[in-house]
């Protein structure tokens, strides 16, 4: 299936794989696109009614086969009785709703309702399955008409048309054998031999029914149907369903692979020994503008460590939007991707930035053991991690080495027309990618762990660090409380000391002022006028001035 999807790249037009996704930048970190396809979803189904009559009409040989028929009926009862009980249990609490119009003339069927009070507890799937089963069941009149038709027919495969319904295909697997072999041989064979032959044929038919419709017998409500059972239901002509629903051969194959065709048992008759199956064939609706892209990654080396970029296997683009794509309910064909339900779901903004070319938004993880691709062929060029595997030019016999500052090597015909890598010889084309990608020119994303053991270990380490951080925070809270109490006491001491210093300062200033005042009084000289000073040696001018 991977090879089939890879070949899709050749048949799809080039413009489908360009646009929102920056393949150039992604290729620098080892991510390349390997294909793109349109997107189809299975929608409302068309139904076919199939009646499998397990007990043939044996009127002509009834006298010789009573013992074998009784044993065969007992065998059928062990299979059909549990199915009938299960169907009754599912549908007993579902009743039809009549319109609220009081007039009998205008009273008509309006739908079905679930008797929730009687049912008690039921899941959404059980409720939906029960209502769908009730809606596909025939009414009593249709069942009686069908039973009458089956009792009167001696044909192995007969189409029965009922009023207002599509064609019903009735299958009686042993009837041809009875009509064409046993009845003509009644005059030549003894009753014992006829009974033995019929018994063996019935046992073989019983085994065949169990093999073909075993899933429906085990799961009467929503079992998938095999291609063998589908061919059996169509009388061996598989082209009928292709013509009726407009399927192509690849569409039908994809629908079968994705288990899109369902068959549910809607009625079991343990008296006439027949079962009624409703086979649902889904219609296909292409979602315009949605393209599904397949991705592959190549590991790259940073020093001695080998890494690869973690991206999903598939993504979807529609306009500017990039979405995740779940391939579980899908099948891939050359014409497109067919899914039994909507497989698109939102992508994180960070991963969208990665696909749009921001390599720093692309997470990476270490390669575990030998897991991971180490080379891939894209656009005719070989993208290889030649630091982890041996790359050799087959033409010249020389080794292609990868420098430590390169994370990947891109090999084209201008470097080496024929390359031998990891024991595989590949002829490459003209260059579509640069010669090499250097580590210092790439912004790599954050490293993450994907292995369960690594994730568990990292979570354990994170929890341990958080516990240690909590202990440190508690210790710091205690220290802060201590400092807060000590700071209040210290503040009081400081205020008292400042007050004492201020009082002492005031006293000192007061004492100094008084002392200075006393000194100025003592130093004042009062001259006595009765004494004459000694003026010997004094100049006359000074004396005259005196």
UniProtKB/Swiss-Prot annotation:
Highest taxon in the source lineage: Viruses
GO CC terms, sorted: host cell plasma membrane; membrane; viral envelope; virion membrane
Glycosylation sites: 25, 57, 63
Region ranges (Fusion peptide): 109-133
Assembly mode: Homotrimer of disulfide-linked F1-F2.
Cytoplasmic side: 513-546
Family: Belongs to the paramyxoviruses fusion glycoprotein family.
Modified how: The inactive precursor F0 is glycosylated and proteolytically cleaved into F1 and F2 to be functionally active. The cleavage is mediated by cellular proteases during the transport and maturation of the polypeptide.
Stretches of the chain found on the membrane's Extracellular side: 20-491
Membrane topology listed for this record: Single-pass type I membrane protein; Single-pass membrane protein
Annotated TM spans: 492-512
Location within or outside the cell: Virion membrane; Host cell membrane
Residues annotated as signal peptide: 1-19
Protein name: Fusion glycoprotein F0
Site (Cleavage): 108-109
One Pfam short name: Fusion_gly
Cystine bridges: 330-339, 354-362, 386-391, 393-416
UniProt gene name: F
Biological-process GO terms, alphabetical: fusion of virus membrane with host plasma membrane; symbiont entry into host cell
Keywords: Cleavage on pair of basic residues, Coiled coil, Disulfide bond, Fusion of virus membrane with host cell membrane, Fusion of virus membrane with host membrane, Glycoprotein, Host cell membrane, Host membrane, Membrane, Signal, Transmembrane, Transmembrane helix, Viral envelope protein, Viral penetration into host cytoplasm, Virion, Virus entry into host cell
Coiled coil: 134-162, 458-483
């Amino acid at each position: 299936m991977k090879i089939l999807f890879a070949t899709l790249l050749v048949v799809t037009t080039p413009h489908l794989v360009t646009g929102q996704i920056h393949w150039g930048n992604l290729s620098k970190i080892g991510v390349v696109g390997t294909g793109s396809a349109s997107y189809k979803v299975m929608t409302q189904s068309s139904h076919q009614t199939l009646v499998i009559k397990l007990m043939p009409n044996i009127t002509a040989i009834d006298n010789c086969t009573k013992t074998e028929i009784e044993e065969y009926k007992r065998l059928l009862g062990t299979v059909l009785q549990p199915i009938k009980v299960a169907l009754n249990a599912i549908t007993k609490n579902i009743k039809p709703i009549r319109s609220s119009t009081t007039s009998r003339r205008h009273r008509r069927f309006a739908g079905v309702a679930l008797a929730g009070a009687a049912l008690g507890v039921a899941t959404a799937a059980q409720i939906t399955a029960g209502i769908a089963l009730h809606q596909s069941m025939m009414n009593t009149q249709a069942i009686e008409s069908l039973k009458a038709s089956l009792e009167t027919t001696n044909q192995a495969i007969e189409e029965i048309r009922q009023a207002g319904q599509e064609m019903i295909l009735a299958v009686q697997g042993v009837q041809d054998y009875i009509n064409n072999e046993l009845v003509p041989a009644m005059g030549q064979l003894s009753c014992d031999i006829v009974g033995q032959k019929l018994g063996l044929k019935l046992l073989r038919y019983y085994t065949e029914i169990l093999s073909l419709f075993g899933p429906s017998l085990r799961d009467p409500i929503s079992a998938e149907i095999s291609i063998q059972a589908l061919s059996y239901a169509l009388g061996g002509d598989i082209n009928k369903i292709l013509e009726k629903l407009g399927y192509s051969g690849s569409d039908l194959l994809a629908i079968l692979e994705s288990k899109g065709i369902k068959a549910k048992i809607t009625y079991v008759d343990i008296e006439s020994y027949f079962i009624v199956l409703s086979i649902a064939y889904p219609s296909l609706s292409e979602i315009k503008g949605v393209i599904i892209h397949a991705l592959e990654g190549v590991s790259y080396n940073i020093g001695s460590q080998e890494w690869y970029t973690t991206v999903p296997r598939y993504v979807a683009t529609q306009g500017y939007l990039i979405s995740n794509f779940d391939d579980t309910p899908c099948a891939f064909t050359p014409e497109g991707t067919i899914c039994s339900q909507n497989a698109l779901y939102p992508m994180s903004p960070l991963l969208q930035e990665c696909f749009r070319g921001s390599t720093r938004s692309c997470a990476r993880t270490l390669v575990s053991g030998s897991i991971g691709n180490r080379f891939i062929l894209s656009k005719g060029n070989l993208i290889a991690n030649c630091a982890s595997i041996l790359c050799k030019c087959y033409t010249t016999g020389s080794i292609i080495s990868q420098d430590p500052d390169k994370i990947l090597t891109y090999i084209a015909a201008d470097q080496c027309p024929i390359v031998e890598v990891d024991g595989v010889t590949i002829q490459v084309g003209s260059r579509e990618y640069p010669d090499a990608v250097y580590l210092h020119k790439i912004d790599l994303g954050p490293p993450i762990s994907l292995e369960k053991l690594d994730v568990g270990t990292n979570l354990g380490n994170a929890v341990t660090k958080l516990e240690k951080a909590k202990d440190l925070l508690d210790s710091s809270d205690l220290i802060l409380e201590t400092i807060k109490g000590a700071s209040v006491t210290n503040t009081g001491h400081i205020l008292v000391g400042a007050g004492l210093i201020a009082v002492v300062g005031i006293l000192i200033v007061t004492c100094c002022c008084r002392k200075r005042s006393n000194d100025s009084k003592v130093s004042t000289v009062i001259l006595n006028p009765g004494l004459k000073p000694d003026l010997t040696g004094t100049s006359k001018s000074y004396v005259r001035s005196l």
